[in-house]
Amino acid sequence: MSESLYIDASGYTFAHEHLHIDLSSFKNNIDCRLDQYDLICGEMKTLYALGVRNIIEMTNRYMGRNPQFMLDIMRDTGMNVMACTGYYQHDFYPAHVVSTPTEKLAQEMINEIEIGIEGTELKAGIIAEIGSSVDVITPDEAKMFAAAAIAHRETGRPISTHTSFSTMGLEQLALLKNHGVELSRVVIGHCDLKDNLDNIFRMIDLGAYVQFDTIGKNNYYPDEKRVAMLGEIARRGLLDHVMLSMDITRRSHLKGNGGPGFDYLLTTFVPLLLEAGFTQADVDLMLRDNPSVFFK
């Protein structure tokens, strides 16, 4: 389990989460340092009791990743945590990214998949979250997508992306396809932050998966609209290309700090889906079956 290259297909998977992340220096806000072990450990135990078996952890290089924290969570809760490798988005790149050759960036990712992360036994199971800016893919971001493609071709591990406010998903897919990536091995993140159905249908038609992974962040986009968009996807028979998550990133998101907590997805959002006419099989498809296929 400690290598986390595979997931437990018997339970649910939260496809885009953070257990330890620190963007506080970028955002000048201590709330953006998610590191409270006891609270997070408690929430993972709650999720485990609700049938969740896997957390796909999206904190990559220079985002405050902590591999020992993840290993401890697995040991203390039984939850499987799949770690990632890569770089996030232009505004968060360290200075050396600009001058580092694409091939070297790719090799860093390959090493974290095949050897381990920062000297630990934890190996990355996914290349993520590879990001783009709002309405643009910068040249350095394009270089990072190229590096991710090389790492994918070398290791076979899937790619999970970050779109800023649900923009540039189609452009990300075009870039990855040009670099030889089979799009069925790509999931486009944060597709649920605006009215986005036309693009979602086009991305699924290209073979990619899409994530509704900011569930509960009603200040960005209301969950009722997420349910409505998922309803349209269901009516077209395309839920087999959808995965769900919450993208917890702040201390204030944790239940112990007054936030919704990780279990909001199951205790609040899933009931909204069922009330809207979704079946339990639909829920299982998005939370269990699709991740079991994609993250294999």
Where are the regions that the model predicts?
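Mid-to-C-terminal alpha-helical segments outside catalytic/metal-binding sites
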Residues: 1-5, 264-296
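Divalent metal-coordination and catalytic microenvironments
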Residues: 16, 55, 87, 152, ...
